[in-house]
Amino acid sequence: MDIENLNQIPIVVEQSARGERAYDIYSRLLKERIIFLVGPIEDYMANVVVAQLLFLESENPDQDIHLYINSPGGLVSAGLAIYDTMQFIKPDVSTLCIGQAASMGALLLTAGAKDKRFALPNVRCMIHQPLGGFSGQASDIDIHAQEILKVREKLNQIFKLHTSQTIKTIQKDTDRDNFMSANEATKYGLIDKVLAKR
């Protein structure tokens, strides 16, 4: 979320016996334990999402947190910071894809608590291997290539853990961009259920 878009964020006014209070819509939804992960996954966004997860855990460690995802993916390190926090905290994190969950967005979608991973009917999910482009000395390029292979193996292990697919299947399916509908994502094990209505 960048500064230019702050003027476009709706404000919600809540009335109580003590008067009125204005919230931006995302802060109001956070009170309902809903976190929005929207847009490219980068360091700033990851820090905000991690902070929200930790805050909601401190507020009530026994109540589910709802993570709504509409993301084309992004940085592996930023995504893994969110992933690790989702697994670390006590509350279950329920995930819901709205729009798209591609690349790291798909990994975070499938990382939700078992039987609490959802998608709306017209979403698109996409999984693939990590991307990287490097220049420099041959030895440095080789170091980066080896690191990408290690990262790929790590991401494949995470997908295996949450989808119950075999490593061999995941390696084949992530070799190129692999797009899925909501129903296909359910069959693959990325999500548990497609939601058409509340």
From Swiss-Prot:
UniProt source species: Ruthia magnifica subsp. Calyptogena magnifica
Family: Belongs to the peptidase S14 family.
Enzyme superclass (EC): hydrolase
GO molecular function annotations of the record: ATP-dependent peptidase activity; ATPase binding; serine-type endopeptidase activity
Catalyses which reaction(s): Hydrolysis of proteins to small peptides in the presence of ATP and magnesium. alpha-casein is the usual test substrate. In the absence of ATP, only oligopeptides shorter than five residues are hydrolyzed (such as succinyl-Leu-Tyr-|-NHMec, and Leu-Tyr-Leu-|-Tyr-Trp, in which cleavage of the -Tyr-|-Leu- and -Tyr-|-Trp bonds also occurs)
Active site: S103, H128
Origin: domain of life: Bacteria
A Pfam short name: CLP_protease
Assembly behavior: Fourteen ClpP subunits assemble into 2 heptameric rings which stack back to back to give a disk-like structure with a central cavity, resembling the structure of eukaryotic proteasomes.
The keyword DNA repair is assigned to this record: no
Main location: cytoplasm
Subcellular location: Cytoplasm
Protein name in the entry: ATP-dependent Clp protease proteolytic subunit
Keywords, comma-separated and alphabetical: Cytoplasm, Hydrolase, Protease, Serine protease
Record PROSITE patterns: CLP_PROTEASE_SER
EC number: 3.4.21.92
Residue pairs linked by disulfide bridges in the UniProt entry: none
Gene Ontology cellular component terms for the protein in this record: cytoplasm; endopeptidase Clp complex
GO biological process, one term: protein quality control for misfolded or incompletely synthesized proteins
Protein purpose: Cleaves peptides in various proteins in a process that requires ATP hydrolysis. Has a chymotrypsin-like activity. Plays a major role in the degradation of misfolded proteins.
